[in-house]
């Protein structure tokens, strides 16, 4: 493994991306070009030599990190983020790909399936997504196809579908999974087909309160719906730290600040209550409102058993910052759902979320390097967004 993504790989991605709008806009690729043209020589070989010779203190590690963040700044400009106001360009799905899916789905259902329209859904990062209008035995049916991207974020179809079906069986409002292809034999990656849920993203007062209530309702479900291991809450916390640490080690050379962060979390992080089912990406954008169906929660690839504070800290202190400041979120959580933590608990669980983000975002770099569909967002996430989370982690664990 190398510390930097090879320049030739990046330049090939730029050339391909300029011919395929599904891989990124021209503005994004211009930012990527600025990054690769101006980043200079990789400082990490010299840093690795220093790490082999002596223990490098946190202050020096953070100085290195600040240099890396400055170098990667153009890539932050290429990242589309979770901004729900962004309008993504309408991109048609490759007819050959969607035809293969329709043929496969028809075989699975034992029905005649044909494609009326298929378009790329923008805004998601863990999956390629299509919005597809089908005729199933002559009946119009609208579905979403979620396709893996080489292990992006360390998530997979089997676990996501298991979580969705388990939660649906427990009465929680999730999209119905119609069919699963877990071999990669149709599209080269596993995927599943689910119902297209009607609804819109809401950021008004009532909409935000409904999101909070939905997360609270999720936490009220028995953890055994997803995990019947009977582990203690303490064990779950330590297992989750080790899970994310193990993931980053599969995708990048050793990071002294991530290792330090993991050790800090093992020493300081404590459960705030019994283990619950955690969404892992809760907040505006992953909740759709419909007048008839009410609220449906989507994007379950991160669902797992953990501490409720993981969801609340992510919502209030990270994902929800575009909507309200952290203090406003904390006050609303207390009023709507009775969620209250000490300042130290908020700090600890914010650190865990930054740790998780620093680890998981490195998978995007692997996906970008491996190809063949290299997007501007993959590189931005695997480099610049990773460094942002790592900086925020170090602000807490190296303080």
Residue ranges and their predicted role:
Residues 1, 119-134, 139-140, 144-145, ...:
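Active-site acidic catalytic loop and adjacent metal/ATP-binding pocket
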Residues 2-34:
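Short terminal alpha-helical segments
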Residues 6-9, 16, 34-41, 309-341, ...:
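Active-site activation/catalytic loop segments of kinase-like enzymes and analogous catalytic loops
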Residues 14, 42-77, 86-91, 328, ...:
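ATP/Mg2+ or Mg2+-diphosphate-binding catalytic cores
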Residues 19-26, 40-44, 55-61, 252-255:
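Charged, low-complexity interaction regions
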Residues 96-112, 220-280:
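An alpha-helical support segment within catalytic cores of ATP-dependent transferases
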Residues 112-119:
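Conserved N-terminal boundary motif of the eukaryotic protein kinase catalytic domain
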Residues 119-242, 246-257:
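ATP-binding pocket architecture of kinase catalytic cores
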